[in-house]
Amino acid sequence: GKDINNNMEKAACATSSLVTQDDLQYHSLSKQQNESPQPLVGTGKKSPESLVKPDATPLSSPRHVRIKNWGSGMTFQDTLHHKAKGILTCRSKSCLGSIMTPKSLTRGPRDKPTPPDELLPQAIEFVNLSLEISVQDQIPPVCNDCQYYGSFKEAKIEEHLA
């Protein structure tokens, strides 16, 4: 099946890995050689085509990029990278082409510590919310105990004796 991004679903048991620059180089080499895949390093004589510099830029993108949805565990073969307008930020071990980090959701490191007049109200709000949630979680059991024992005091005495 396909999803809304034209990703083609692959078997869930297939192993997934990040696309590496080495994968892209291998693909561009095999494409140059009329789609006949050949190993980059042979066991015999090494031809100039089989030697690839690690920092060489690939001439073309692979037809499919394997993408894993870590939430569902499903693996897809994505083709949207063919429509990319810019060069993807790829290294030999990872590709950041599909990671979305909008500036509105990211913050850089602060130049200086948060001033106390800004930090104190945030801390007070955090503590109040924490206490409010904690108390709300305890209200039903306390009410049940009060109804069972007839009073809050008896409920607390029974709790300590148990």
Curated annotation (Swiss-Prot):
InterPro entries listed in its UniProt record: NOS, NOS_dom_1, NOS_N_sf
Bias kind Polar residues: ranges: 24-37
Modulation of this protein's activity: Regulated by calcium/calmodulin.
Induction comment: By lipopolysaccharide (LPS).
Subcellular location: Cytoplasm, Cytosol
Modification after translation (UniProt): Polyubiquitinated; mediated by SPSB1, SPSB2 and SPSB4, leading to proteasomal degradation.
GO molecular function: calmodulin binding; metal ion binding; nitric-oxide synthase activity
Protein keywords: Calcium, Calmodulin-binding, Cytoplasm, FAD, Flavoprotein, FMN, Heme, Iron, Metal-binding, NADP, Oxidoreductase, Ubl conjugation, Zinc
Cofactor note: Binds 1 FAD. Binds 1 FMN.
GO cellular component: cytosol
Ligand binding (Zn(2+)): C90, C95
Protein name as catalogued: Nitric oxide synthase, inducible
Gene designation: NOS2
